[in-house]
Amino acid sequence: MGPEEKTIMTERSAAVFIQAWWRGMLVRRTLLHAALRAWIIQCWWRQVLEKLLAKRRRMVLEFYVQQEWAAVRLQSWVRMWCVRQRYCRLLNAVRIIQVYWRWHSCHSRVFIEGHYELKENQLNIQLEISLGLQACKVQQCIPLPLKE
């Protein structure tokens, strides 16, 4: 092998080396572009998944709030019903006590006071009747038929 052949071989190996380097650069550039595009797609997909997850969380939270509000409303209605029942029972008891008290006070506190005068042919009556807090005054002149 002569010096010319050596230079041809070195030129050829240099050309092969440059071609390999260039092909490697092209492949690396293509891989870099593919990796960047894949990274962009992955970022977009993560955002989509995060939005879906946030939407699901929001729906679950709204459902929970709705359930809680319904439970609170139902509890308040039940409490109101219990209080109303108790109030009605107490009101009926008060009415019964009032009826008996009024009956008792009317029947136990009757006070009758009266005067009468008999003059010639008429009878003068003055009566005062007290029923508890109420008073009634009666004054009447009654003519008497006398047989002569």
UniProtKB/Swiss-Prot annotation:
IQ domain: residues covered: 11-40, 67-96
UniProtKB keywords: Repeat
Top-rank lineage group of the source organism: Eukaryota
Molecular function GO labels: calmodulin binding
InterPro entries: IQ_motif_EF-hand-BS, IQCF
Annotated PANTHER family: IQ DOMAIN-CONTAINING PROTEIN F5, IQ MOTIF CONTAINING F
This protein's name: IQ domain-containing protein F5
Gene name linked to the record: IQCF5
